[in-house]
Curated annotation (Swiss-Prot):
The keyword Nucleotidyltransferase does not apply. This is tRNA-specific 2-thiouridylase MnmA. One of its GO terms (cellular component) is cytoplasm. Keywords: ATP-binding, Cytoplasm, Disulfide bond, Nucleotide-binding, RNA-binding, Transferase, tRNA processing, tRNA-binding. It is found in: Cytoplasm. Its EC number is 2.8.1.13. The active site is at 111 (nucleophile), 207 (cysteine persulfide intermediate). Residues 106-108 are annotated as: Interaction with target base in tRNA. Pfam families: tRNA_Me_trans, tRNA_Me_trans_C, tRNA_Me_trans_M. ATP binds at residues 20-27, 46, 135.
Length: 370
């Protein structure tokens, strides 16, 4: 049996754990591990989207059935809770405002901070839980009354990027049973213990909304505002349907071929001029307009509760990106900061998160503004 590291458990008094269960293999194996470790485990399924809850894109109905089946198999109680109102108010409203302003938000970051580790945590505490757990790939280290957020052992699955806005208060009640285990091992465990969802594919859609044609989905909530598509030289090469429907670095769906000026390189979204409703595109993955050696970030959130000392760290400007060496400088008068990189970063995108690391320790981060 795989044992949890003692430093990953909030305290020696932790007995009752409420785990968020999605119906997927990760949270199912995490629940089994907790039960095997002797904790009193309750599974909690969150229903957070209702606008068009159908089986084509949102698998909530089948996911719930999978949760019930797994809970029955491993011998734990399970219940469902509806946080749709909280999700719409705390996450989705911000999501739409950011897109309307021309930025590209990351709803998973806000969903974790506001729903999975706030609304869910509050509900779990009302059930008498000592701690909560999820199937995230990350680690926590409880030492001396403080908590550190660390990368998962499986670097290819590490989700600390999405968790960087969690506070000491939230992390003090959190367990991540899968943080020390490779994803391949999780699949093996699921098969060995006979979980029916052992081969269920991982979800990749927007947090809780599911996998669906994104532009079509966004167009239901934001109006089309057509405008020109121009090159860095100012040549008009097409028309866009609205700046909200494009993101920096985007290659597909621009509506241009690769031969506007006799150059066969692919077109990429390089800039969005909101004031003039103009979409700028550039040819070639390494075009200068797609590269940046510095960024500014706002609304910083630090895991320790305090901004780190200025200096050399590493950072991610998007999920699954390899860490890049950087120099961090805090703005002492605001909750903002800047990062400079010796190696140019590709398609640094306003609205996304810039997350700072000291080795495996996730320090926190902020929202990229420029």
């Amino acid at each position: 049996m795989i044992s949890l590291n003692s430093s990953s458990i909030p305290s020696s008094q932790t007995k009752k754990v409420v785990i968020g269960m999605s119906g997927g293999v990760d949270s199912s194996v995490a629940a089994w591990m907790l039960k095997e470790q002797g904790f009193e485990v309750i599974g909690l399924f969150m229903k957070n989207w209702e606008d068009d809850d159908n089986d084509e894109y949102c698998s909530a109905r089948q996911d719930w059935l999978d949760v019930v089946s797994v809970a029955d198999m491993i011998g734990i109680d399970v219940e469902a809770v509806n946080f749709a109102a909280e999700y719409r108010e705390r996450v989705f409203a911000d999501f739409l405002c950011e897109y309307a302003a021309g930025r590209t938000p990351n709803p998973d970051v806000l969903c974790n901070a506001e729903i999975k580790f706030k609304a869910f945590l509050d509900h779990a505490m009302s059930l008498g839980a000592d701690a909560i757990a999820t199937g995230h790939y990350a680690r926590v280290r409880h030492e001396g009354g403080r908590v550190q957020l660390l990368k998962a052992v499986d670097a290819s699955k590490d989700q600390s990027y999405f968790l960087h806005r969690l506070t000491q208060q939230q992390l003090s009640k959190v367990m991540f049973p899968l943080g020390e285990i490779p994803k391949t091992e999780v699949r093996k465990i699921a098969e060995q213990i006979g979980l029916h969802n052992a081969k269920k594919k991982d979800s990749t859609g927007i947090c809780f909304i599911g996998e669906r044609p994104f532009r079509e989905f966004l167009n239901r909530y934001l109006p089309r505002v057509p405008g020109p598509i121009k090159t860095p030289e100012g040549k008009t090469v097409g028309e866009h349907m609205g700046l909200a429907f494009f993101t920096l670095g985007q290659r597909k769906g621009i509506g241009l071929g690769g031969s506007q000026d006799g150059n066969g390189d692919a077109w990429y979204v390089a800039r969005k001029d909101m004031a003039n409703n103009t979409l700028y595109v550039a040819q070639g993955h390494e075009h200068p307009w797609l590269l940046a050696n510095k960024l500014s970030a706002v609304d910083a959130s630090w895991v320790s509760g305090a901004a780190p000392e200025p200096g050399s760290y590493s950072a991610k400007t998007r999920y699954r990106q390899t860490d890049s060496a950087c120099t961090y400088i805090a703005d002492i008068d605001t909750n903002n900061f800047s990062l400079s990189f010796p190696e140019a970063q590709w398609a640094v995108t306003p609205g996304q998160s810039a997350v700072l690391y000291d080795g495996d320790i996730c320090l926190g981060g902020g929202i990229i503004s420029t």
